[in-house]
Amino acid sequence: GFYFRSIQGFYFKRIQGNICSEPKKVGRCRRSFPRFYFDSETGKCTPFIYGGCGGNGNNFETLHACRAICRA
């Protein structure tokens, strides 16, 4: 996954900022995986359907993971 920890928190903050600011990408495949992404306009984790390939890091399997990483 994309959840990294460090004692200083430096790497976590850099990755968190990059992932959470990425746009929602459903991907180019046609599968249907329920996922969550952080919507930077609303400040909330929002459900979407992921196609299975070609997405980005703003793609979480659970609402809990999205909230934990993006602090929503």
UniProtKB/Swiss-Prot annotation:
Asked if Secreted is a keyword of the record, the answer is yes
Q: Which Gene3D superfamilies match?
A: Pancreatic trypsin inhibitor Kunitz domain
The residue ranges of the BPTI/Kunitz inhibitor domain are 20-70
Kindly list the residues the record flags as site (Important for the stabilization when complexed with trypsin).
Answer: 61
The highest taxon in the source lineage is Eukaryota
Q: Which UniProt keywords apply?
A: Cleavage on pair of basic residues, Disulfide bond, Ion channel impairing toxin, Nematocyst, Protease inhibitor, Secreted, Serine protease inhibitor, Signal, Toxin
Q: Which compartments is it annotated to reside in?
A: Nematocyst; Secreted
Task: Extract the PROSITE patterns matched here.
Answer: BPTI_KUNITZ_1 (PS00280), BPTI_KUNITZ_2 (PS50279)
Disulfide linkages recorded for this protein, renumbered to the chain, are 20-70, 29-53, 45-66
Give the signal peptide range: 1-9
Q: Where is this site: Reactive bond for trypsin?
A: 30-31
Q: Could you give a GO molecular-function term held by this entry?
A: toxin activity
How does activity behave across temperatures?
A: Optimum temperature is 25 degrees Celsius. The ability to inhibit trypsin slowly decreases as the temperature increases to 70% inhibition at 100 degrees Celsius.
Q: What GO cellular component term, any one, is given?
A: extracellular space
Query: Which Pfam families does its entry note?
Result: Kunitz_BPTI (PF00014)
Q: Which residues form the propeptide?
A: 10-16
Primary location: other
Q: What else is known?
A: A synonymy between H.magnifica and R.crispa is controversial.
Q: What family name appears in the similarity comment? A: Belongs to the venom Kunitz-type family. Sea anemone type 2 potassium channel toxin subfamily.
Q: What does this protein do?
A: Serine protease inhibitor that also shows protective effect in a cytotoxicity model. It inhibits the serine protease trypsin (Ki=630 nM). It significantly increases neuroblastoma cell viability in an in vitro neurotoxicity model, being a consequence of an effective decrease of reactive oxygen species (ROS) level in the cells. It also seems to protect cells by inhibiting ATP-induced purinoceptor (P2RX7) activation.
Entries under PANTHER family matching the protein: BPTI_KUNITZ INHIBITOR DOMAIN-CONTAINING PROTEIN, KUNITZ-TYPE PROTEASE INHIBITOR-RELATED
Q: What is this protein called?
A: PI-stichotoxin-Hcr2k
